[in-house]
C-alpha cells in the first residue's frame, strides 16, 4: 500500500509534466502573427515569394511525397485548388527536401497540378516551425496567419470550412 502511495505521489507530477511538454509542441504560437516571407524556386526553376501574393488569401501546405497522410490529403488540396483559385485563393504547396524529379514523378502518377515550391535546404520550414508533415497555414489578405493545421485535413469539406477564415 505504501508503494502505491509513493508511485502516485511521485508519478503524477512526472506524468503531468510529460503531458504538458507534449502539448507545447502543438501550441499554435504562430497564429495571428505575420507570415514570414520567403523566396523559393518552383519546379520550373523560377523564384516565388510569399509577398507577391499580398492582398490575396493564401493556403500554404508543407508536405513530402513519402508521407502517407500527405498523400491522402493531396487529392483534397487539388480539388480545393481547382475550385477556389477562381475565387481568389492562392494555394501553395511547399515540398520539404525532395528533388524536383521525385515531385514531378509523384504529381504525374497522381494527376496533380498544384503549384509546388522547393524547400530543399529546409530553411522555410524551420522558419515556420514545422515539426512534421503535413502542416497547413491559412494566411489572410494582410499576410496574417489565421490558422495552423497540424496533420492532414480529413476531407475537402473541412478545408473549405477553414477557408472561410481567410476568404472574407
Regions found by a protein language model. Name each.
Residues 1-12:
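Bacterial N-terminal signal peptides that target proteins for export
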Residues 105-112, 120-166:
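Thiol/disulfide oxidoreductase modules built on the thioredoxin-like
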Residues 22-50:
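N-terminal "domain-start" segment that seeds a small globular fold
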Residues 54, 62-79:
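Conserved redox-active cysteine motifs that mediate thiol-disulfide chemistry
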Residues 11-20:
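Bacterial N-terminal signal peptides
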Residues 59-60, 91:
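Hydrophobic beta-strand anchors of alpha/beta hydrolase catalytic cores
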Residues 71-110, 120-127:
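Structural microenvironment flanking redox-active thiols in thiol-disulfide oxidoreductases
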Amino acid at each position: 500500500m505504501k508503494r502505491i502511495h509513493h508511485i502516485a505521489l511521485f508519478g503524477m507530477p512526472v506524468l503531468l509534466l510529460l503531458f504538458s511538454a507534449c502539448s507545447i509542441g502543438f501550441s499554435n504560437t504562430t497564429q495571428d502573427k505575420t507570415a514570414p516571407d520567403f523566396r523559393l524556386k518552383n519546379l520550373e526553376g523560377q523564384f516565388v515569394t510569399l509577398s507577391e501574393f499580398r492582398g490575396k488569401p493564401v493556403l500554404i501546405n508543407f508536405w513530402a511525397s513519402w508521407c502517407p497522410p500527405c498523400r491522402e490529403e493531396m487529392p483534397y488540396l487539388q480539388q480545393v485548388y481547382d475550385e477556389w483559385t477562381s475565387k481568389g485563393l492562392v494555394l501553395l504547396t511547399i515540398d520539404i527536401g525532395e528533388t524536383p524529379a521525385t515531385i514531378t514523378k509523384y504529381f504525374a502518377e497522381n494527376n496533380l497540378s498544384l503549384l509546388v515550391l522547393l524547400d530543399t535546404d529546409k530553411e522555410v520550414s524551420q522558419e515556420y516551425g514545422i515539426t512534421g508533415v503535413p502542416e497547413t497555414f491559412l494566411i489572410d489578405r494582410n499576410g496574417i496567419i489565421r490558422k495552423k493545421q497540424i496533420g492532414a485535413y480529413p476531407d475537402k469539406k473541412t478545408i473549405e470550412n477553414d477557408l472561410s477564415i481567410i476568404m472574407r
